Structure formats: structure tokens, C-alpha cells
Amino acid sequence: MKYKSIGNVETKYYQIPEELVLESGKKISDVTLAYETYGTLNWDKSNAILVCHALTGDAHAAGWHEGDRKPGWWDIIIGPGKALDTRKYFIICSNVIGGCKGSTGPSSINPDTGESYGLDFPVVTIKDMVNAQKKLIDYLGISKLLAVIGGSMGGLQVLQWSVSYPDMVKKAIPIATAGYSTPQQIAFNEVGRIAIVSDPNWNSGNYYGEKEPTHGLALARMIGHITYLSDDSMHQKFGRRLQDKNEYEFDFSREFEVESYLHYQGLTFTERFDANSYLYLTKAIDYFDLTENNSLAEGLKNVEAKFLVISFTSDWLYPPYQLREIVMALSANNADVTYREIESNYGHDSFLLESGQLNYVLNNFLSHTYVSDIMIEDIATIKEGISIDEAARVMFEKEITHLPLVSSDSKLVGLVTSWDISKSIALKSDNLEEIMTKNVVTARPDEPIEKAAEKMESKDISALPVIDKDRRVIGMVTSEDISRLIEEF
């Protein structure tokens, strides 16, 4: 099936009003974030999904810019009818700080000097990127994200979001990524950086307005691009075919198709990316490590999100064992986690190319709504011993029709409704326990919303207190919430 694109889009810009304090302790002012949004934010701002880009990505994740020859880098996933359906969700994607596609980075103008930062730009980390994104999300007035999703370096950001802001992320989807950078990953990044700094035109990062280190950056891209492919995909794409010739030349010219391909990838990359940004972003990847006391489980102990962790069989840059390690760490903390290992020959680039399988897996996870996704968390309750008059006053002031009665340790004892209050007046009763419901029908936060709806329909009730495993009241879900969900999605 062919799906529509979202059409033409524009990049927006947000300037953080205060200084951004970095993990290194340094501060940077006048930070700008380039971002794009797709879809419509609903009235209670509960349908927002943050998409985090990979090393060489940007804010342009979907749709078309005027004059573009191709759409945004994840157009296969974002748009009407796709997993990130813009008819349902409000999608946000921003360029990371340290980047070169509109957000503040080493190629930006340093307000103190009036010239490009170059290496005066402070080193940033994945945590710094996420903290900057948090400023943007606050600016958009969003208190909780329905999901945060990203592949590769984007997956690192997803994991950092779940650790730094656990109460802001309902669903986390890290793809083709890791809980920490391995020595092999760091080694590949270092070779790329050496290629750049060895270019005479790099000039210690002060090349803006001069000849740029295109040779070094192209070589770094060629090295990196090899790690994004797989042996199978290279066999299928190139084999041992020669480029525009039938016999060996017995010299050192480019003879094989794969050689021409890599040179083309390197050359075109230099036209859209900044060499210093490549240094900064790969360094941020190297520093990424969520373990505490050499334990990833310890580092992920405070996460609250539901997780979908996705790997690809042929990915040797972020191999499946690293994604399974994330799953095991989450499971050790009793986190709600689903793991999917997708069969693919595309290597690490699978997350950008596997449209069919990835859309299917993502759609199944995102469209499965649980009670915790729509329940009202900050609800009023009353304690045992309260009078009917006091209960009625709470209902009136809070403009609610259902009021859970709880014990001193917040465990559910009963439920008082506005109907019960009316009944007490008719019966001239002043004993709350006589008129309240004692055998309360409840919901659990991890229940599918369909099950909660069935309970309401079968019992002819309009609200369910949500309780945890110890019967403590943690929220309320109403028929109105469910009806609104159906209307929106």
C-alpha cells in the first residue's frame, strides 16, 4: 500500500531564553534549536511524540522542503496512514545542539566574538542534547510525551530521556542503539575524527570562510558508512562488479562499483554537513554510558516508561546483543518492555529503510492503549470518617462526580458518586459508609483500555478508580476519557 506524504513543511526555530548549563559545567547562551512539527496537538496535549535523529540527521524528518529532491529522512514512518500517523499524533523533531542544521553548534556565530565558534564551542553530551530538547518541549506547553522514539544516536537520546525525565515519557522506543558506547564503536568514531583533523584545511577547527576540510570529512563519512551497511547488503548492491569497465586496469584507480559508491557518499556528505559538528557529535556518542557501578540495570532503575526495544539481525554497529542487554536491564527493574528483533539485510541502516516491518511493529505498539495512557493521575480522594457534607463539598469544588474513599495508607475502601450524595438526601442519611459503593469495580494501569471499557459497559458505570498491586488509588479513568480517545484516534 502507498501512503501519502505530509506535503510541504517548514523548519521553525526556538531560542532558549536562559543559559544552558552543560554536563561539563560550562554554560552557553543564545542557544537556538531548529525543529519541525507534523500533525496537530490535541486539546490536552497528550498526543505528542518526539522523534530523535541519528548522527548525520536533522530536524527535517518528514515531508518536503521547497525545491527538495527527496523527503525528510524518516518519511517512510511519519505521515498519514504510517506508524507515526499525523492524523493521530503530533510529531516533533529537533536538530541536536552541536549539530549544523539550524541548531547552535560549532559553525554558529559566537555572540562574544561575532565569528564562528569553531573549537571554542563547548563539548556537549547526549544528556545536554536531551536537556535542550526538554526546553523546547516545555516551550510547546507539553507536560508529558506520548512517546520518544529514535534510532542509532537517536536511540541514545530516547534512553537518556527515560532516565533524565522519567515522569515525562509514557512510551520509549530505542532502535538499533545501546545503553553505552562500546570500545569498537568508539574506535570507529576516533578513526573518523582523525581523518578530519589530519586534513590540512581543518586548521584546528578555524576553517570557516576558508577552504574546508572536505577530504577529511569525506573519508570520515566513507568509514562510517561502511559500518551502516552489512556484508549481505553490499553483496546484493555491488557484488564484485566493476564500474564502467569489463577488465582490471592493474592500477590504483577506482575500479569496483563499491569504491565509486563510497566516494560518492563521501563527496555528497561534505555538501550538507560540517566537519566540526562531526567531531562534536561523535564525541558525545563516545561519552554515552548509562551504567551505574558497571550495571546498566542500576542506571535504568528509575525509568517509568513502557518500552519497545528494536534491533536488526544484520546490524553489526549496534548488534542485537546490545539491545537485548537493554531489555534484560529493564526487566531486572520490572519495567514494562517488549523486544522485537527484525530480520533484515540492510545492516545498521535498517531503521531508515525497513518500512514494512518497522511500520507494523511500531503501529502495534503505539496503537495499543493502556489505562495508564489516559487515566487522570492527580485525583481527589477522601479519608475514612469524613462526613457526607464534606464529601459533597469536595465534589463541588473539584467539579467531579466520583470520589474514592481511602484508608490512611491510601488503599481503596469505597467509592462515593454524586448519585450517592443525592440518595443520602432522599434517605436523610448522614452516614457516608451506608450510601457508598464498597465492592468497587477497579482498573489496573497496565490493563488494555478495551478491558476497562468492557467493565464500564457491563456494570453500567462511568468511571473506574485505578489501583496498583497494593490497592492504592493512583488515578481514575472515565467513560468520557475513552470516548475522547475514540474521537481523536
Swiss-Prot record:
Q: What is its EC number?
A: 2.3.1.31
Protein name per Swiss-Prot or TrEMBL? Homoserine O-acetyltransferase
- Its main subcellular localisation, reduced to a broad class, is cytoplasm
SMART domains attached to this UniProt entry: CBS
- Annotated catalytic residues: 152, 315, 348
Domain CBS residue range list: 375-434, 436-489
- Protein location: Cytoplasm
For this UniProt record, the keywords arranged alphabetically read as follows:
Acyltransferase, Amino-acid biosynthesis, CBS domain, Cytoplasm, Methionine biosynthesis, Repeat, Transferase
Positions contributing to substrate binding: 221, 349
Per the record, its GO cellular-component terms are: cytoplasm
Residue span, AB hydrolase-1 domain: 47-354
Organism of origin is Methanohalobium evestigatum (strain ATCC BAA-1072 / DSM 3721 / NBRC 107634 / OCM 161 / Z-7303)
Molecular functions (GO terms): homoserine O-acetyltransferase activity
GO annotation, biological process: homoserine metabolic process; methionine biosynthetic process
PROSITE patterns xref list: CBS
- InterPro entries per the UniProt record, alphabetical: AB_hydrolase_1, AB_hydrolase_fold, CBS_dom, CBS_dom_sf, HAT_MetX-like
Q: What does this protein do?
A: Transfers an acetyl group from acetyl-CoA to L-homoserine, forming acetyl-L-homoserine.
Q: Does the keyword Transferase apply?
A: yes
| Quaternary organization | Homodimer.
Catalytic activities: L-homoserine + acetyl-CoA = O-acetyl-L-homoserine + CoA
Pathway where it operates? Amino-acid biosynthesis; L-methionine biosynthesis via de novo pathway; O-acetyl-L-homoserine from L-homoserine: step 1/1
On whether Acyltransferase is a keyword of this UniProt record, the answer is yes
Q: Give the UniProt family note.
A: Belongs to the AB hydrolase superfamily. MetX family.
Q: Which PANTHER family match?
A: HOMOSERINE O-ACETYLTRANSFERASE (PTHR32268:SF11)
